[in-house]
Regions:
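A short alpha-helix capping/helix-loop junction motif
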Residues: 101-108
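Generic anion/oxyanion-binding catalytic loop in active/binding sites
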Residues: 78
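Polybasic, Ser/Thr-rich amphipathic helices
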Residues: 1-5
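Phosphate-recognition beta-domain surfaces
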Residues: 6-42, 47-75, 88-96, 110-292, ...
Length: 455
């Protein structure tokens, strides 16, 4: 470890391309310039805060500065200096952005606690809180939310805490146990634990890159926002407010294939299309892979990823790429177990089979179920969903909901174009006739939309 602390600035500089190193040097010259514009060779915390301005919260600026200042320079005469030298600046950025897990872990450790003595889990938790808050802050400040507007002016604290808890849940202690909550906060964290955490939780490194690239306006060309936040395609004249915020979108996107991360197309929303199961079916069928999200009346947010187009039929569909997830009150994903192939189910208008949308489990006992009698559903898991090993996702096993969204992922492939202009009742005459025979009202009649190519 000691060698990592004493690596020379020249060696660290070699990790950057020549044009990148020139940009790093230019930023250092700006930070280290006195009021007269003369470079002093070092810079202070105040100079860094003055440069960053409102782009990052002050707490994160201090953490970045502490991380730089604690890099041991090769010139030992600078070791007790309270300012940051060019060598320290370059070494910190090089190791944080381009270093190995060991080197990144060391820089993170330097940022976590500036005080002497052992680092405890509560220190890591506070660092993670500052990191998550800084990412949400800087993306908002730089206008890089890519269309994801919050229902409030900023990302809700509950969402930040859910993301923090999710990141910490992957931290392993020396006894092999993972972080379990407040009872772990006084446990000591060593360098090896932080290195392993950084390695197993890619979001830590990615979030730090966002803070540097967008907070310091450094090496911006090496960061593509679309790899982190998909573009929100929901052009409704500003009327639409998603259940999701930017942090939950980042979390979900990270579990998708690259081709599904670039843009998300709003297919259905109760806010825009009303409480209608036939409207839901007509908007989500033949649309390719999709993500459905619900918020029950108790505030729990959850849903599932459908790996292929939804089709109305009494058989299960989909494949083992499907998964269930929860967003609030905690973030988690639940992958297939291999126990069965009950990945996706969508049926309507039949008397002998369940009518509704389901994922996982079995008929009448789904891991996630939205009834055709819209606004009702269930999430049954005693002890867990057989298909996805998911717990109960909703607050109550049988739940009510008013908010639901379905997002098409990526571009709509040609094979699906032309299939999505008909009502589900038009394309499924059997469902239509059975609905009429049963005497049930056709709530969607008269509510048909203009075909998409005529908008």
């Amino acid at each position: 470890m000691g060698n990592a602390k004493s690596l020379s600035g020249q060696k660290m500089a070699s990790r950057f391309l020549p044009e990148e190193q020139a940009e790093v040097d230019k930023l250092f010259d700006v930070l280290s310039s006195s009021e007269g514009g003369v470079a002093t060779g070092t810079f202070s915390l105040e100079a860094m805060k003055s440069h960053v301005k409102e782009a990052l919260p002050p707490a994160m600026v201090s953490r970045l500065y502490n991380g730089m200042q604690r890099v041991k320079p090769t010139d030992r005469t600078l070791g007790s200096c309270r300012s940051v030298s060019r060598e320290q600046f370059t070494a910190f950025l090089s190791q944080l952005l381009r270093g190995s897990c060991e080197e990144k872990g060391l820089m993170v450790m330097n940022m976590i606690s500036a005080a002497e003595g052992p680092t405890k889990t509560r220190d890591v938790q506070k660092f993670t809180e500052d990191l998550v808050a800084s990412v949400a802050h800087v993306l908002t400040h730089r206008h890089e939310l890519r269309g994801w507007t919050c229902r409030k002016s900023e990302v809700p604290p509950d969402s930040m805490q859910a993301m923090v808890a999710q990141l910490l849940s992957e931290m392993k202690f020396q006894d092999g146990y993972k972080f379990q909550g407040p009872q772990c906060l006084d446990q000591v964290c060593d360098q090896a634990m932080i290195e392993e955490w950084v390695f197993h939780v890619p979001h830590v490194g990615v979030f730090l890159s966002v803070v540097v690239h967008r907070g310091l306006c450094l090496l911006g060309s090496s960061f593509d926002p679309s790899t982190l936040v998909p573009e929100c395609l929901a052009d409704q004249g500003g009327r639409f407010e998603s259940i999701l915020d930017v942090l939950s979108v980042i979390y979900l996107s990270s579990h998708l294939a690259p081709e599904h991360r670039q843009r998300w197309r709003l297919l259905f929303s109760t806010q825009l299309h009303g409480q209608s199961f036939s409207q839901l079916c007509s908007h989500i069928t033949s649309q390719g892979p999709s993500l459905l999200v619900l918020e029950d009346r108790d505030g729990y947010v959850f849903g599932g990823f459908a790996s292929c187009s939804w089709e109305v039929k009494p058989q299960f569909q989909g494949d083992n790429r499907c998964f269930l997830f929860s967003i609030a009150p905690r973030m988690a994903t639940h992958l297939h177990t291999g126990y069965n192939n009950h990945f996706m189910y969508l049926n309507y208008g039949q008397q002998t089979m369940p009518n509704g949308l389901g994922m996982g489990g079995q008929h009448h006992y789904f891991g996630l179920w939205v009834a055709a009698d819209f606004g009702k559903g269930h999430s049954k898991a005693k002890p867990a969903c057989t298909t996805y090993n998911s717990p109960q996702l909703s607050a109550q096993e049988d739940f009510l909901f008013d908010k639901m969204e379905v997002w098409g992922l990526g571009n709509l492939l040609e094979e699906y174009e032309g299939k999505n202009k008909k009502s589900v009742l038009d394309s499924n005459p059997e469902a239509r006739s059975l609905l009429e025979i049963s005497g049930r009202a056709r709530h969607s009649e008269g509510l048909r939309e203009v075909p998409r190519d005529e908008d």
